[in-house]
Regions:
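C-terminal interaction appendages of subunits in large macromolecular complexes
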Residues: 319, 323, 327-331, 346-562
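Amphipathic alpha-helical
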Residues: 307-340
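Conserved, well-folded catalytic cores of nucleic-acid-processing
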Residues: 10-21, 25, 47-57, 91, ...
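GHKL (Bergerat-fold) ATPase N-terminal catalytic module, capturing the glycine-rich phosphate-binding loop
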Residues: 1-107, 112, 119, 135
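GHKL/Bergerat-fold ATPase module
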Residues: 81, 99-101, 122, 138-168, ...
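ATP-binding catalytic core of ATPases
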Residues: 75-136, 147, 154-185
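GHKL/Histidine-kinase-like ATPase module
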Residues: 108, 143-254, 333-353, 357-358, ...
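Extended active-site and interfacial segments that coordinate phosphate-rich ligands
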Residues: 7-25, 40, 64-72, 79-80, ...
């Protein structure tokens, strides 16, 4: 209970100045106002047109009544109350077309509110609830007796009081965590991993986190809301606190409970709280360490996780200009053409031959097609592995990483760069082989210029290839924008004009090249143009690109078959 002075102090002061002023005026006391009677009390006026508080303190001779309509001050008068304690009486506002205040008179609505916001208050919150039960069957009831029911009231404790995250770990079974997760976060599947954390020191908190077993239906949409449920001493103050999680770990669900949040009245002040920032940094490290542990100790489960949320990790590495790339790079998985399984970048590095200069990759829409690319086959024939990237974000992720740590032959720290098998020099040829290709390109300059003119600006250059073995032709990209990146960017609004600088590469040892030379030497410009169109279209198809002009391509094929 409260005395007259305590009613005046706890309710009157806040009524005059507001909770933030109350905090400011009492900042020297270093008080925590969550749970203080009065703070949040005035939210009652959101639903009530009058609030009455009747209280009698322990050992006091008189009870006092505080009353206010929330408009102009309050009254404080003596009251009749024999027992010690406090009663709060709300006179609800009248219902309107938009607000139904009378719903707060329904016991299930009140019970739901308590369950949602105050389920873990340390003290029991009880309420008399009306229930129904079947009456005992009379002894003389006949065969046609129909069961009768009666209503009764029962005092029910609405809150759990001791949250699962504060119970000793040896008292909580996996099934308990799974049930809590499914009930709390409305998921029908068990979580993939449960993370518990208790941190004391600069930031003191208890956390119970879950990595879901499946991707939420709206996860990769703008409608998805990230965040952890934030509690202060068992009172939920925010259902989804987004500031506790970085975007790349936005799939994590759970609760965080802290007893020493420094300022926790509103979202605005909470978001600026240093304790919250410390908790976020600590949680981020904890989640990353748990993912590493899963990767190293339970690979099958990690690959399940990667299938569901790997894309988000890659987006995290790429976003913000690669600010978090180094933090996340060891969590990345890609398909290995040589190993025929998912591998980490470190696992790729560990199996690289000493003479290998790059981490090779190919990007496209399927691993089967990528493994058959002429340039990928060339790298694989050399005994080097190729990472096969099949998601839009993959190549952007590796581009932002640029390189990965690798010790040289002397054990000194160094790095090795990523290399698209369809871009630039692959570092596979000797200087003599490069010189021979350059000489062959110069020797056939007239032919290549005629082919470039026939393709009317579709390629930057036509040249002799050093990356073709059995295939007659391929496309490569000159510059930072690869052909696959062009495909991805072309899907974005306003990016229709983004083009990579394509190079048409020819195999001078293939019979098709002899046919090209013959058409040029015979002065058959029409045939040379058709050959050029066919070869460019063939190179497009190999790269998974749509043919620019399918009708012209079909006509060229048919005319050459006559």
């Amino acid at each position: 209970g409260m005395t007259k002075d305590e009613l005046e102090k706890n309710l009157g002061t806040i009524a005059r100045s507001g909770s933030l002023d109350f905090k400011t005026e009492n900042q020297s006391d270093n008080i925590d106002i969550i749970g203080q009677f009065g703070v949040g009390f005035y939210s009652a006026f959101m639903v009530a047109k009058k609030v009455t508080v009747i209280s009698r303190a322990q050992g006091a001779d008189t009870a006092w009544k505080w009353e206010s309509t929330g408009v102009e001050g309050y009254t404080l008068t003596e009251a009749d109350k024999e027992d010690v304690g406090t009663e709060i009486i709300l006179v609800l506002k009248d219902d309107t077309d938009t607000d139904k205040y009378s719903e707060y008179l329904e016991d299930y609505e009140l019970a739901n509110l308590v369950k949602k916001y105050s389920d873990y208050i340390r003290f029991p919150i009880t309420m008399y609830r009306e229930k129904s039960r079947q009456k005992p069957k009379p002894e003389d009831a006949g065969d046609d007796y129909k069961p009768e029911y009666e209503t009764y009231t029962e005092l029910e404790t609405l809150n759990s009081m001791v949250p699962i995250w504060k119970r000793p770990k040896n008292e909580v079974k996996d099934e308990d965590y799974n049930e809590f997760y499914k009930n709390k976060f409305m998921d029908y599947t068990d979580p993939l991993r449960v993370i518990t954390s208790r941190t004391e020191g600069t930031a003191t908190y208890t956390a119970l986190l879950f990595i879901p077993g499946s991707t939420p239906y709206d996860y990769y949409t703008k409608e998805y809301e990230k965040g952890l449920a934030l509690y202060a001493s068992g009172v939920m103050i925010m259902e989804k606190c987004a500031d506790l999680l970085p975007d790349y770990f936005s799939f994590v669900k759970g609760v965080v409970d802290s007893e020493d949040l420094s300022l926790n009245i509103s979202r605005e002040t909470l978001q600026k709280d240093n304790q919250l920032k410390l908790m976020r940094n600590s949680l981020e490290k904890k989640i990353k360490n748990e993912l590493h542990a899963m990767l190293n100790n339970d690979r099958a489960k990690y690959e399940e996780f990667w299938k569901e949320f790997g894309r988000q990790i890659k987006f995290g590495a790429y976003s913000d200009y690669g600010m978090h790339a180094e933090l996340l790079r060891d969590l990345l998985l890609f398909w290995s053409a040589k190993e025929q399984k998912m591998v980490t970048l470190q696992e790729y590095i560990d199996k690289m031959p000493a003479e290998q200069k790059y981490i090779y990759f190919a990007a496209g829409d399927s691993t089967d097609r990528l493994a058959k690319l002429p340039s990928a086959e060339l790298v694989l024939d050399k005994g080097f592995d190729v990472l096969l990237l099949t998601e839009d974000v993959d190549e952007f992720c590796l581009q932002i990483l640029h390189s990965y740590p690798r010790k040289d032959a002397e054990g000194k720290d160094g790095t090795v760069e990523f290399k698209n098998v369809n871009s630039g020099d692959l570092g596979l040829e000797s200087e003599e082989e490069k010189k021979a290709a350059e000489d062959a390109t110069a020797e056939n300059k007239a032919l290549f210029d005629a082919m470039k003119d026939a393709l009317n600006g579709k390629v930057k250059e036509v040249k002799v290839s050093t990356r073709l073995k059995d295939h007659p032709v391929c496309l490569s990209a000159d510059g930072p924008l690869s052909i696959e990146m062009e495909k991805v960017l072309s899907k974005q609004p306003g990016s229709e004009g983004v083009k990579s600088d394509k190079v048409l590469e020819l195999n001078v040892n293939h019979p098709v090249f002899a046919a090209l030379k013959a058409a040029q030497e015979a002065g058959d410009t029409e045939k040379l143009n058709k050959y050029s169109t066919l070869l460019y279209a063939q190179a497009q198809l190999i790269e998974g690109l749509p043919v620019d002009d399918p009708a012209a391509y079909a006509e060229a094929v048919c005319s050459l078959m006559k």
